[in-house]
Structures are given as C-alpha cells and as structure tokens.
C-alpha cells in the first residue's frame, strides 16, 4: 500500500500561496498582460511540488527507486555510511521531476546521519561526497543493508528528512523531500543485480532499481 499524502506536497504550500498572491495582485493592478509571467510561475511551482501516488511492484527482493529522475551512475563504490563496498546507483533529479523521496525497501532504520557540504551540480560524481547530504541506512528483515542518501544540488539547498533511527519503513513510504533539483544515491550489498542503466528515466516507487541477492 502506498503511503498516503496530498497530491501537492505540503512542502510546497507556502511557495504556492506566495506565487498565487503575487499573480493576483499584479493581475488586479496591471491586468493579464503584465501578470501572465507570474501566472506561469505559479503553474511551474505547482507542478514542481506535485507528489502523485505510484504503484508499488510486488516482488519481495526488489529495491525500488527512491526518487524520480535519470540514472547517472551504476557502479561498485565504497559506502561510507555503512563502511562497506557496495553497488551504487545514483538518480539525478532536475527541476521538472517530483522531488519527494520514498523508501526503496521494507526494513528498520539503523542510522540517519546529516552532513553539511557544498552545493555543486548534483549530476556530477563528486556531489556524492562533497555536497550537503543526509543518509538513511535501512536493514531489511533478511539482514541486508540498504543506504539511501539525499544530496543537495546547485539549486536545491534544503534537504528535509522525516524519519529517525529505530523507526520502521515500508517500501514506497515517503520519508523526505529535496527542493529544486538534487540527487539520491542508493548503496546495495554486492551481489545485488542492477535492473537499470545509465541515462534511463526512472520513477519513485514504481521503477525497480535492483534485486537483492536471495
């Protein structure tokens, strides 16, 4: 079952209200000829904060995509948050993607750790280690460790995370949000099988990133 939430993310309500008030005031004073760019801005803000429900695949060993976007890395890398070698899959989100983050697996959170950092272009590799980021480490019922890392970007400078260590997470459960373009890295146990490739467009909760080794 998908985690219930408004179709327009709560994180965007203040921005939408401000954009709507500005558009209305300018329209009232100068008419549509002056106000249309601000109405266009309002439409952009609303679409940015959309947060639609998504179908969740039923395969028990599937690792779901935590965010909408495009795959920019599928590689073996060191997972500094769980201190291991891992399969790393990275998703880059541009300003037109949905920006909520959802849990890739069922499990219990063993660690939530925030790191201040830079605001480099989130599409480049060194954003993984140099940018502001927040790591959520999850242990599945079978003992597998999955790390999901929210990473700020050039424009995105606000990471929101709503979970803490010790709490359970369900696959597809909404646990965070990053405003205005960003990246999510997922670290999986070696032996996991990637089901996506670089450049592929992916969707939170409904795209299978990988399959855990059984």
Swiss-Prot record:
Residues the UniProt record annotates as site (Cleavage (non-hydrolytic)): 181-182
| Name assigned to this protein | Phosphatidylserine decarboxylase proenzyme
Q: Which Pfam families match?
A: PS_Dcarbxylase
Per the record, membrane topology reads: Peripheral membrane protein
Query: Which PANTHER family does the record associate with it?
Result: ARCHAETIDYLSERINE DECARBOXYLASE PROENZYME-RELATED (PTHR35809:SF1)
Pyruvic acid (Ser) carried by residues: 182
Give the record's GO biological process terms: phosphatidylethanolamine biosynthetic process
**Which InterPro entries does the annotation name?**
PS_Dcarbxylase, PSD-A
What EC number(s) are associated with this protein in UniProt?
4.1.1.65
Q: Which EC class is this protein assigned?
A: lyase
The pathway that the record names for this protein is: Phospholipid metabolism; phosphatidylethanolamine biosynthesis; phosphatidylethanolamine from CDP-diacylglycerol: step 2/2
Q: Which domain of life is it from?
A: Bacteria
Q: What does the UniProt PTM comment say about this protein?
A: Is synthesized initially as an inactive proenzyme. Formation of the active enzyme involves a self-maturation process in which the active site pyruvoyl group is generated from an internal serine residue via an autocatalytic post-translational modification. Two non-identical subunits are generated from the proenzyme in this reaction, and the pyruvate is formed at the N-terminus of the alpha chain, which is derived from the carboxyl end of the proenzyme.
Presence of keyword Mitochondrion: no
Gene this protein is translated from: psd
Reaction(s) catalysed (UniProt annotation) = a 1,2-diacyl-sn-glycero-3-phospho-L-serine + H(+) = a 1,2-diacyl-sn-glycero-3-phosphoethanolamine + CO2
Cofactor dependency: pyruvate
